[in-house]
UniProtKB/Swiss-Prot annotation:
Name of the coding gene: truA
PANTHER family: PSEUDOURIDYLATE SYNTHASE, TRNA PSEUDOURIDINE SYNTHASE-LIKE 1
Biological-process GO terms, alphabetical: tRNA pseudouridine synthesis
Protein name per UniProt: tRNA pseudouridine synthase A
Family: Belongs to the tRNA pseudouridine synthase TruA family.
InterPro entries: PsdUridine_synth_cat_dom_sf (IPR020103), PsdUridine_synth_TruA (IPR001406), PsdUridine_synth_TruA_a/b_dom (IPR020097), PsdUridine_synth_TruA_C (IPR020095), TruA/RsuA/RluB/E/F_N (IPR020094)
Binding site for substrate: Y111
Keywords per UniProt: Isomerase, tRNA processing
Active-site annotation: D52
Disulfide bonds: none
Record note on quaternary structure: Homodimer.
Length: 246
């Protein structure tokens, strides 16, 4: 039995999240079905984390054990032949130690959020972006982003259904970048609470759109009160960019 690590990318718009659900299409479900076609036996995959319904990934990490003798390049081609139509692609395969776990061995995770901040765009450019009509001040947004850096209790930006014992998370970096008609928010953290990034983005944008003070965001963060968080930004503009390992 060999353990294989796979880097995968996917369009989350067609799926009800990563984690398998009996009656709904999911990323995990599609990959496990593809593996079963090749292996002829059920294979369970493990991931670095579970993305929500509608969220995309540029480089999600999964592992699985396989007992057939097949070259990695041939396995990659076979999987992509099955998966590309449902919007999932295997980017890379490699062998790893049996002790490796994509979630527990992960050191950091990077997410990005794409904001379309221009009236000059084609309709399809908004499919994986959040359209904001008002011209945003990137300096104001970056002042709020700086407040996130460090170790904080993110109860305010957690979902009531999140079962994490601790709401403390360490944020290594958080910044907004202008990229043509888009503003991209990039955040790197040890890990994230359920819907945390989208709640943060929605709150920062609401404060900026309403011309409220930067200090409002810090007050909301420190309140540890979910009711003070603003609108949760939509999932279609969120990407899991990268998972970092030692």
């Amino acid at each position: 039995m060999k353990k294989i690590l796979a880097e995968i990318a996917y369009d989350g718009s067609m799926y009800h999240g990563f984690q398998i659900q009996p009656t709904k299409p999911t990323i995990q479900g599609e990959i496990e079905k593809a593996l079963m076609k090749i292996n002829k036996k059920k294979i369970k995959i493990h991931s670095s984390g579970r993305t929500d319904k509608g969220v995309h990934a540029k480089r999600q990490i999964i592992t699985f054990d396989i007992n057939i003798n097949i070259q990695l390049n041939n396995l990659k081609k076979a999987l992509n032949a099955i998966l590309l139509k449902p919007g999932i692609k295997i980017l890379k395969l490699k062998h790893v130690k049996n002790s490796f776990h994509p979630r527990f061995n992960a050191q950091k995770r990077k997410y990005s959020y794409c904001i379309l901040n221009s009236d000059n765009y084609y309709p399809w450019e908004s499919y994986q972006a959040y359209y904001v009509n008002k011209k945003l001040n990137i300096n104001n947004l970056n002042q709020m982003a700086k407040i996130l850096i460090g170790n904080h209790d993110f109860t305010t930006f957690s979902c009531i259904k999140d079962k994490s014992k601790s709401k403390f998370r360490h944020i290594h970096s958080a910044k907004f970048k202008k990229k043509g008609k888009y503003i991209i928010f990039e955040i790197i953290g040890s890990s994230f609470l359920w819907k945390m990034v989208r709640s943060i983005i929605g709150t920062m944008l609401d404060i900026e759109i309403k011309n409220e003070s930067i200090s409002t965001f810090e007050t909301i963060l420190k309140s540890k009160n979910r009711n003070l968080a603003r609108t949760t930004a939509p999932a279609n503009a969120l990407f899991l960019d990268k998972v970092y390992y030692e």
